[in-house]
Amino acid sequence: FLGSIIGALAKGLPSLIALIKK
């Protein structure tokens, strides 16, 4: 369960960083 949450977080992190950097 926790692994899937971390996986989803890792997948969404790049887009999140891109949003912050813009």
From Swiss-Prot:
Modified residues (Lysine amide): 22
Domain of life from the UniProt record: Eukaryota
Annotated tissue distribution: Expressed by the skin glands.
Entry GO CC: extracellular region
Subcellular location: Secreted
Keywords, sorted A to Z: Amidation, Antimicrobial, Secreted
Protein family according to the UniProt entry: Belongs to the frog skin active peptide (FSAP) family. Brevinin subfamily.
Reported function: Antimicrobial peptide.
Protein name: Brevinin-1OKd
Species this chain originates from: Nidirana okinavana
